[in-house]
């Protein structure tokens, strides 16, 4: 005691609170100095002191001790304000759902963390002896984050899936939770009693599995004689000293350590604190230590490889059951881990980035060429710099240079004024070692019914080419235009005026109009009507009987006609994009039997005509043949000059043959009968024989004409032709007979020894040689066709009086459908058309404007005076930007009457089919409307824009719009483009000034010409009125829409938003029809803010907007559904894929340990590992030759994966402050990595492929057999490792008892009872315990060791050289692949 007193006088007094960690350090120092007994004596005194003090203090805890932090109120208010702004941005479509989620999480997380940090200083100042404050530090129960929930705020919770619930709990437990908050906290809080119980059972099961793997590992020897070790390096300061010393203390050195030439530590020396400190100060070379990994034995471990026993600081005793200790020391902290709270909310804790702040106030400048715009992960605009960027901040007197590292985000613009400490850049956090990233899908669902539009191109995902999954290539908005299919008989608001073309949009063919209501409004007379219909969805021809009623109210004249859902049930008169005009013409008078023919007007599927396209064709019945034959153009080739440019490829629907344009007035058709028979059929006639009419050719085929039979055998079929005509055996003198295949005009004399006669008609001479010596001539009859030129077109298409140039021209061209000498085959009694009269579309090229390359055509139906007329409308398209259409309205001068008798000399093309009232029942009406022509003052250009779908509407010119002067000048220069930059087509998001540059629409004093067609006198009356409105084609982009697209929406069940506006001269916002407008865009001066939507109607003083909801989507998002599709509330719109950092938090910690130990893939590293394993297994044998190759490849792979597994498990525990010695984890990892899988190739007779054996056993067997055994490394999980041990009794007592025992019995396995568990099961003595060493015979040991060491040393030497040779290779691999290992710098392989 006196000694103690004497020492006490010299001791230093530390006035510090001592906590758990300090206490641990103190005890370990005490044991170092004084030994165990003395230390326990000292600790007893400390304990007594503590109990005395605690009794005296008498801490009590009442609800009054919970003091709320005063700053909480405004902090929460601030966070709420931020999330409100965020919500607004989301509504405007500026940020998408994932960005919103991230940002709100960060807002609330920051608030909650700030409160937590404020808590302690606050307590310290106001009430330092507050029991809550004291308890939160004691470490006994409760910690800062739990107290924070009592007095701070609970903040964000996460649901059982670990997803964040973005409704923060703002109250703390002192203030009391609201009902919602209570439910959320029950849902997401993982601190319930149940949870603890579940976690405890998990940890218990983990312990059981761990012990199962390693229960047989016992310390059996002092030294296994290995020369290998793992090198740990203290240099670079990369590894924290604490971890470094923890790794080293208690280990045994595998090699001597030199400082220069002086040896400071020898091999097999245990490392204590002093030695570690010396290493740290000297920064010596890498230190090679022995670990359980390097121990040479399979089923036990030696004292030196294990190191010191953690209980009493000496080398571990022989007979110590270190396996069970290891299993328990890993599993037991699991129960501690589970009791940790879920304080961070689980997600997004690793997502905070470092900020660069401005050093002083000033103007910021940087080189804009080095950055490109991007979005931050919160959706804010920013610049991304790809290389180092120097930013200069100019304050009044000084220049500051700030260097911004690559891959950083710049949050300010060039020349912007920044204040001191303002965040100017965000540095992307490097790859954080602690947090694994995982990809999460987030689905966005629609809030309302509506029609989907998007404002950019989308790609189809390749595997869903025909599905509805689209990938977005760039950031864009998706719009849901409100308004669903109409289900009820509501009173709708109509915004259509007289003669507008519109769709009735019913889902079925029946609709009844019940009542007409007329309402007077201040603006104008709005017509309201109600309609109900039955939602029958079958495709059937509707009953049109009640559709003739025209509903009139005042001056409005609205006629509705239904359109069927889909095109399957259309009447035969109108096929898809094809219109046939029946023509009862000349032929019908001559021959009643000929089928009636008609003009077919065909529009390509996409509705676009190129120059010289064929618009319509007429198949003249005179040029129709029933039989097969051959076409010839004439006797001499000059008749058939075919110029290249006159060859027009016909882009039809059915036929794809080229057409030959004829410059000649006649051609010839040589008939023949052709039968194509299968190769197996038996013919009843021979080649070159002559048959009569109706001769039997095969069993079920008879000839139609008589004549000469020719049989040609092709590969799989027989072609049999019958030529009618005369057979002529020529004499020596006949000249003509030398020619073959010539046409002879009439009047040519033909001499013969027997007869002489004049040829009456054209004939065709063909020479036939049945054998070498004989030949004869076949004279075949020829049918001659004359082709007459078309009638002059000028009279048929009266030129448009208002049109002065850029006229669309139509010319008639006759095409022969078959080339010269082409055989024609008739298939089963169909008639063959030889000549087709075609109407070719062409137009003048305008020199000033860009040439029109394509024209868009469609059919329009107009009802005038109770009759329905079809018009063909053709617009020319100048270029994608300016939409200047050309009008072609061939309102015919020759209308056909029904009997067709007076139409004999009218060219068929001038007629446009018109219906009488009686025919309305049969016809299927298209949407109705009118064609309007726009002219400008100088009559220089016009456009034809039709109001086609109900989503479009009219637009009026704006009065007193202040144009920019630039635009005025451009109008003067180029008066040809009055409509600038296109009228925005529907479905295209025309830019809005706040986001992008604005598109302008300019009109000046145009007049509208409406053409009324009156059927009674067939006069064209023009009515010139002041321009009232524009109409706009839905397909501003000149693509024909999908034919079923305009079916579903009812145009009136929409939400309208009316806005009267007087333009702000400042913003000079010019609205184009079909433009999408976001909510926060100011359009009107002092007008109310708009709802988001699409402009569908523009009047002089107001616009009508169809409400729409924007959703922002970023690249890589998947869009579900098709463009224009109707969606219902709750349908999935978009799926985002985003990365979130998985929490390093411990509630996910225990499962994470389990994942690592069961070797389930937790992130991409496992994939890399497997590839590396394969790579090593391939390249090492190549370097080293076969025998050593597999072994070394396997060894290196195993060593690498072992270290990585140990580090991963340690990370989880260390992040929670739980200390576990590495060697425990190493023993477990060694067991799950010590097996190899015998592979198929090189099958040896020892092991069967697919068998799992120990690595060392494979190595020994290979050496004994002196042949290579092919195997590859496997990582077994702990469960699989438990089921693959030496002992079947231990396996059976773990899992799958029946299976294991049955297999063992069948295989005749022997259990040597080496482990603990087998002996416990059978009630034997367990072969462990520190008194066990007396049983081992010393003589045996001595005999065994030298032999083994010789062999291994030989091997070790080779291995060492190889390893040093490949050390560099390894290091590079390591740094690349294992980026998540914090100790990467000091791991090498050392085999000294």
UniProtKB/Swiss-Prot annotation:
One of its GO terms (cellular component) is mitochondrion. GO terms for molecular function: DNA binding; DNA-directed RNA polymerase activity; zinc ion binding. Its cofactor is Zn(2+). One of its GO terms (biological process) is DNA-templated transcription. The keyword Transmembrane does not apply. It catalyses: RNA(n) + a ribonucleoside 5'-triphosphate = RNA(n+1) + diphosphate. Zn(2+) binds at residues 224, 295, 302, 305. It is an enzyme of class 2 (transferase). Keywords: Chloroplast, DNA-directed RNA polymerase, Metal-binding, Nucleotidyltransferase, Plastid, Transcription, Transferase, Zinc. InterPro entries: DNA-dir_RpoC2_beta_pp, RNA_pol_beta''_euk, RNA_pol_Rpb1_3_sf, RNA_pol_Rpb1_4, RNA_pol_Rpb1_5, Rpb1_funnel_sf. Its EC number is 2.7.7.6. CDD domains: RNAP_beta'_C (cd02655). It is found in: Plastid, Chloroplast. Gene3D superfamilies: 1.10.132.30, 1.10.150.390, 1.10.1790.20, RNA polymerase Rpb1, domain 3. Binds 1 Zn(2+) ion per subunit. In plastids the minimal PEP RNA polymerase catalytic core is composed of four subunits: alpha, beta, beta', and beta''. When a (nuclear-encoded) sigma factor is associated with the core the holoenzyme is formed, which can initiate transcription. Belongs to the RNA polymerase beta' chain family. RpoC2 subfamily. DNA-dependent RNA polymerase catalyzes the transcription of DNA into RNA using the four ribonucleoside triphosphates as substrates. HAMAP family: RNApol_bact_RpoC2 (MF_01324). This is DNA-directed RNA polymerase subunit beta''. The gene is rpoC2.
């Amino acid at each position: 005691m006196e000694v103690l007193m004497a020492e006490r006088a010299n001791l230093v007094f530390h006035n510090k609170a001592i906590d758990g960690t300090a206490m641990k350090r103190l005890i370990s120092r005490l044991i170092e100095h004084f030994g165990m007994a003395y230390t326990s004596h000292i600790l007893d005194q400390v304990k007594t002191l503590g109990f005395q003090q605690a009794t005296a203090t008498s801490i009590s805890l009442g609800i009054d001790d919970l003091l709320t932090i005063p700053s909480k109120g405004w902090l929460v208010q601030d966070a709420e304000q931020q999330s409100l702004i965020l919500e607004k941005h989301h509504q405007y479509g500026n940020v998408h759902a994932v960005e919103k989620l991230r940002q709100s999480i960060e807002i609330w997380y920051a608030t909650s963390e700030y409160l937590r940090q404020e808590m302690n200083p606050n307590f310290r100042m106001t009430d330092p002896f507050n029991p809550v404050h004291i308890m939160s530090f004691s470490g006994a129960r409760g910690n800062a984050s739990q107290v924070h929930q009592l007095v701070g705020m609970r903040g964000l919770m996460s649901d059982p899936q670990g997803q964040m619930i973005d409704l923060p709990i703002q109250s703390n437990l002192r203030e009391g939770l609201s009902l919602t908050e209570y439910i959320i906290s029950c849902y997401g809080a993982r601190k319930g009693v149940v949870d603890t119980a579940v976690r405890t059972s998990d940890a218990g099961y983990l312990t059981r599995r761990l012990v199962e793997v390693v229960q047989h590992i016992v310390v059996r020897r002092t030294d296994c004689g290995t020369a290998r070790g793992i090198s740990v390096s203290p240099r670079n300061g990369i590894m924290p000293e604490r971890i470094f010393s923890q790794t080293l203390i208690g280990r045994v050195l595998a090699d001597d350590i030199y400082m220069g030439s002086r040896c400071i530590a020898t091999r097999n020396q245990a490392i204590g604190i002093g030695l570690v400190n010396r290493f740290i100060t000297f920064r010596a070379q890498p230190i090679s230590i022995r670990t359980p990994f390097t121990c040479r034995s399979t089923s036990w471990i030696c004292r030196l490889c294990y190191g010191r026993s953690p209980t009493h600081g000496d080398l571990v005793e022989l007979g110590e059951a270190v396996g069970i200790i290891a299993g328990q020391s890993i599993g037991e902290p699991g129960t501690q881990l589970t009791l940790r709270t879920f304080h961070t909310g689980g997600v997004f804790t690793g997502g905070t980035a470092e900020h660069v702040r401005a050093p002083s106030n000033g103007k910021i400048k940087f080189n804009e060429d080095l950055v490109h715009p991007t979005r931050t992960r919160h959706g804010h605009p920013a610049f991304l710099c790809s290389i180092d960027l120097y930013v200069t901040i100019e304050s009044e007197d000084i220049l500051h240079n700030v260097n911004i590292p690559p891959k950083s985000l710049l949050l300010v613009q060039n020349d912007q004024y920044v204040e001191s400490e303002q965040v100017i850049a965000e540095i992307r956090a490097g790859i954080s070692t602690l947090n694994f990233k995982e990809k999460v899908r987030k689905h966005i669902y629609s809030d309302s019914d509506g029609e989907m539009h998007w404002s950019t191109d989308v790609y189809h995902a390749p595997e869903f080419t025909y599905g509805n999954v689209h990938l977005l290539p760039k950031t864009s908005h998706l719009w849901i235009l409100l308004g669903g299919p109409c289900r009820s008989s509501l009173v709708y608001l109509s915004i259509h005026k007289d003669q507008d073309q519109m769709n009735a949009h019913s889902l079925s063919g029946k609709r009844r109009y019940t009542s007409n209501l007329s309402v007077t409004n201040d603006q104008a007379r709005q017509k309201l009507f109600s309609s109900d219909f039955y939602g029958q969805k079958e495709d059937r021809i509707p009953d049109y009987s009640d559709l003739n009623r025209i509903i009139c109210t005042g001056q409005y004249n609205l006629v509705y006609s239904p359109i069927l859902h889909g095109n399957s049930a259309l009447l035969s008169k109108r096929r898809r994009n094809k219109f046939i005009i029946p023509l009862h013409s000349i032929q019908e008078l001559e021959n009643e039997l000929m089928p009636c023919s008609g003009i077919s007007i065909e529009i390509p599927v996409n509705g676009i005509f190129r120059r010289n396209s064929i618009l319509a064709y007429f198949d003249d019945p005179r040029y129709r043949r029933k039989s097969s034959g051959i076409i010839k153009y004439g006797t001499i080739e000059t008749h058939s000059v075919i110029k290249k440019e006159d060859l027009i490829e016909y882009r039809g629907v059915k036929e794809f043959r080229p057409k030959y344009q004829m410059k000649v007035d006649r051609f010839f058709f040589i008939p023949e009968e052709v039968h194509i028979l299968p190769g197996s059929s038996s013919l009843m006639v021979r080649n070159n024989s002559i048959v009569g009419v109706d001769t039997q050719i095969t069993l079920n085929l008879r000839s139609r004409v008589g004549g000469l039979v020719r049989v040609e055998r092709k590969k799989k079929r027989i072609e049999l032709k019958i030529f009618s005509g005369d057979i002529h055996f020529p004499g020596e003198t006949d000249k003509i007979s030398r020619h073959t295949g010539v046409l002879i005009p009439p009047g040519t004399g033909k001499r013969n020894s027997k007869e002489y006669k004049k040829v009456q008609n054209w004939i065709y001479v063909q020479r036939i040689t049945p054998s070498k010596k004989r030949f004869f001539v076949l004279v075949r009859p020829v049918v001659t066709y004359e082709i007459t030129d078309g009638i002059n077109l000028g009279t048929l298409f009266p030129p448009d009086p208002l049109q002065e140039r850029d006229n669309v021209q139509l010319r008639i061209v006759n095409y022969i459908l078959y080339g010269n000498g082409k055989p024609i085959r008739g298939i089963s009694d169909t008639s063959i058309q030889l000549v087709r009269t075609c109407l070719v579309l062409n137009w003048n090229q305008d020199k000033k404007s860009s040439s029109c390359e394509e024209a868009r055509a469609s059919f329009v139906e107009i009802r005038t005076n109770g009759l329905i007329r079809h018009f063909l409308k053709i617009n020319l398209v100048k270029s994608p930007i300016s939409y200047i259409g050309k009008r072609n309205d061939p309102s015919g001068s020759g209308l056909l009457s029904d009997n067709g008798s007076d139409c004999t000399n009218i060219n068929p093309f001038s007629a446009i089919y018109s219906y009488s009232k009686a025919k309305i029942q049969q016809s299927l009406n298209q949407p109705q409307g009118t064609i309007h022509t726009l002219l400008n003052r100088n009559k220089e250009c016009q456009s034809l824009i039709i109001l086609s779908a109900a989503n479009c509407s009219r637009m009026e010119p704006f009065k007193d719009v202040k144009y920019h002067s630039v635009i005025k000048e451009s109008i003067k220069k180029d008066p040809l483009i009055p409509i600038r930059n296109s009228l925005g087509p529907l479905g295209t998001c025309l830019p809005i000034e706040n986001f992008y540059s604005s598109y302008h629409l300019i009109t000046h004093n145009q007049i509208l010409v409406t053409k009324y067609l009156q059927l009674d006198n067939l006069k064209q009356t023009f009515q010139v009125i002041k321009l009232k409105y524009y109409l706009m084609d839905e397909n501003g982009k000149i693509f024909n829409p999908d034919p079923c697209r305009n079916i579903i929406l009812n145009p009136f069940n929409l939400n309208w938003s009316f806005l009267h506006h007087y333009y702000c001269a400042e913003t000079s916002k010019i609205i184009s029809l079909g433009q999408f407008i976001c909510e926060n865009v100011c359009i009107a001066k002092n007008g109310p803010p708009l709802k988001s939507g699409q402009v569908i109607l523009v009047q002089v003083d107001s616009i009508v907007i169809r409400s729409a909801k924007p959703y922002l989507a970023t690249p890589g998002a998947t869009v579900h559904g098709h463009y224009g599709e109707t969606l219902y509330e709750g349908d999935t719109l978009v799926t985002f894929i985003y990365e979130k950092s998985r929490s390093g938090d411990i509630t996910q910690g225990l499962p994470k340990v389990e994942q690592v130990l069961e070797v389930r893939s937790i992130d991409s590293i496992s994939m890399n590992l497997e590839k590396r394993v394969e790579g090593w297994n391939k390249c090492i044998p190549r370097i080293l030759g076969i025998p050593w190759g597999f072994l070394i490849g396997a060894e290196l792979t195993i060593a690498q994966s072992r270290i990585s597994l140990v580090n991963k498990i340690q990370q989880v525990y260390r992040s929670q402050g739980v200390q576990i010695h590495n060697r425990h984890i190493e023993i477990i990892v060694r067991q799950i990595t010590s097996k190899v899988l015998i592979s198929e190739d090189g099958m040896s007779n020892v092991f069967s492929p697919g068998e799992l054996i120990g690595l060392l056993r494979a190595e020994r067997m290979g050496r004994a057999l002196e042949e290579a055994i092919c195997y590859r490394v496997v990582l077994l999980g702990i469960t699989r490792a438990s089921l693959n041990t030496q002992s079947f009794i231990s396996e059976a007592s773990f899992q799958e008892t029946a299976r294991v025992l049955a297999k063992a019995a069948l295989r005749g396995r022997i259990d040597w009872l080496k482990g603990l568990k087998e002996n416990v099961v059978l009630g034997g003595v367990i072969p462990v315990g520190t008194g066990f060493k007396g049983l081992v015979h010393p003589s045996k040991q001595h005999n065994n060791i030298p032999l083994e060491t010789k062999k291994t040393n030989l091997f070790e030497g080779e291995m060492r050289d190889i390893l040093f040779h490949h050390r560099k290779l390894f290091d590079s691999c390591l740094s690349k692949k294992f980026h998540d290992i914090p100790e990467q710098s000091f791991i090498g392989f050392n085999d000294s």
